[in-house]
Amino acid sequence: MKKTAVIVFSGGQDSTTCLIHALPLYDEVHCITFDYGQRHHAEIETAQRLSKQLGATVHKVLDASLLNELAISSLTRDNIPVPTVNSSGESLPSTFVPGRNILFLTLASIYAYQVKAETVITGVCETDFSGYPDCRDEFVKALNKALELGMEYKLRLETPLMWLNKAETWALADYHNQLELVREQTLTCYNGIMGSGCANCDACNLRAKGLNAYLENKTQVMDSLKSKMGLK
């Protein structure tokens, strides 16, 4: 029986690592990128390029522009500054887009239903993240149950990075011999700068700290990754 997965794909470090990891595990991997009026259109262009370069079966860009009207965030509004690493903390940073993962995972699951995919993959992570509530394991499990009930369809929301720290996420890219591609060709920066980014926003800070931690202790981090994910 053909195994098919759908990936919520932004062209950033996490979703690209998920794509790299999924490709040898599934017969078909479909990438879904959402155009929600995000601050930097380069995100969509990067996702299109990487999905083709890495060999995804299908890549679709879906219009989710309604989210831009409803969700006010520094990632959807040019007049709201992206916070720096040293910004004093609110309970949620201004980069949080309320409802984004709810909407994206729901739409990806509807697409999965149509193509008879059994898995929807997302790169959310509870270990190293910016405090977003929709990156938590309990949220994903609750939404998974709701989607199965609402569509009467057996579906798994898979989160391969959920319990990895950023160093281990870098190790996973290296495990698949794609460390340099992820390092140089993905777009994680909230200010829209490719690769290492601006070095000033929270996304770049997490990414750089994780990479440094991995490069300083590759063997130990790789062993930890293999233990967590059951890799050989």
UniProtKB/Swiss-Prot annotation:
Co-factor requirement: Zn(2+)
Biochemical pathway: Purine metabolism; 7-cyano-7-deazaguanine biosynthesis
Keyword Methyltransferase in record: no
Binding note for cofactor: Binds 1 zinc ion per subunit.
SUPFAM superfamilies documented for this protein: Adenine nucleotide alpha hydrolases-like
A biological process from GO: queuosine biosynthetic process
Keyword tRNA processing: no
Annotated positions binding Zn(2+): C189, C198, C201, C204
HAMAP family to which the protein is assigned, alphabetical: QueC (MF_01633)
Protein name: 7-cyano-7-deazaguanine synthase 2
Gene behind the chain: queC2
